[in-house]
């Protein structure tokens, strides 16, 4: 669970707080230096426990934006936590990966949110959200994304080739990105960028569009400099800061 506040991590001036199971504290502190760490109680599966819910709810009051789902895990505790975050957060929430999987049994929770929501499913997650096949999703991406966003009052980022971003009314189809970005970590990077832009004051739809475009452009430049086969998520992250200066 990432809580963002301030000017945005891509500018190295954001306040970023990471909420995570206590047992991974040594790993977090040995690899990251920028975030504020907020370790909380965990269950037997080493994921966030229901006992951490009060602490997480308190942390929501600190944030300008919340991103939840990346590496979260799937069990009863995480389902309760994600649903409660959606219902109680007064700031925008970005749902990715297991954050999306955690609402599959209670999609109506999206309609009970107090604050704006952004969902970032890949085609498989989108298929599970609407009870369809991946082939059905891929055959009608724009209509399906737009309908879901309209029915659930959210911004939807349907990832893939030509990522679709929609608020249920307007639609943006992205033209940046390449097959080399189909690797672990790129979706997490995008989620963080969307959350960062929202924390800087952008509305959710604009933040999602900008993040998707710049994220894809970052991947394209990385592929040009290295190769689509050889590029890594670390290569993209190393390039992002310099790329952002082009948009100031």
Each model region followed by its residue ranges:
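Small-residue (G/A/S/T)-rich helix-start motifs and N-terminal tracts that mark the onset
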Residues: 4-92, 101-118, 123-248
């Amino acid at each position: 669970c990432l809580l963002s506040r301030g000017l945005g991590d891509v500018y190295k001036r954001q306040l970023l707080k990471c909420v995570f199971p206590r047992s991974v504290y040594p790993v977090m502190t040995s690899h990251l230096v920028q975030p504020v760490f907020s370790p909380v109680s965990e269950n037997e599966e080493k994921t966030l426990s229901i006992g951490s819910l009060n602490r997480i709810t308190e942390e929501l009051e600190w944030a300008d934006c919340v991103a939840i789902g990346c590496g979260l895990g799937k069990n009863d505790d995480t389902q309760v936590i994600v649903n409660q975050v959606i219902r109680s957060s007064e700031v925008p929430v970005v749902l990715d990966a297991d954050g999306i999987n955690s609402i599959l049994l209670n999609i109506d929770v999206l309609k009970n949110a107090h604050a704006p929501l952004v969902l970032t499913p890949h085609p498989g997650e989108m298929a599970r959200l609407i009870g369809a096949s991946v082939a059905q999703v891929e055959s009608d991406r724009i209509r399906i994304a737009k309908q879901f966003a309209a029915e659930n009052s959210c911004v939807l980022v349907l990832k893939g080739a030509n990522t679709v971003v929609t608020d249920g009314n307007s639609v943006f189809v992205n033209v940046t990105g390449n097959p080399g970005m189909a690797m672990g970590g790129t979706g997490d990077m995008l989620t963080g960028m969307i959350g960062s832009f929202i924390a800087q004051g952008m509305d959710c739809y604009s933040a999602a569009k900008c993040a998707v475009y710049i994220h894809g452009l970052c991947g394209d430049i990385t592929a040009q400099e290295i190769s689509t086969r050889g590029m890594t998520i670390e290569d993209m992250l190393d390039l992002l800061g310099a790329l952002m200066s082009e948009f100031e």
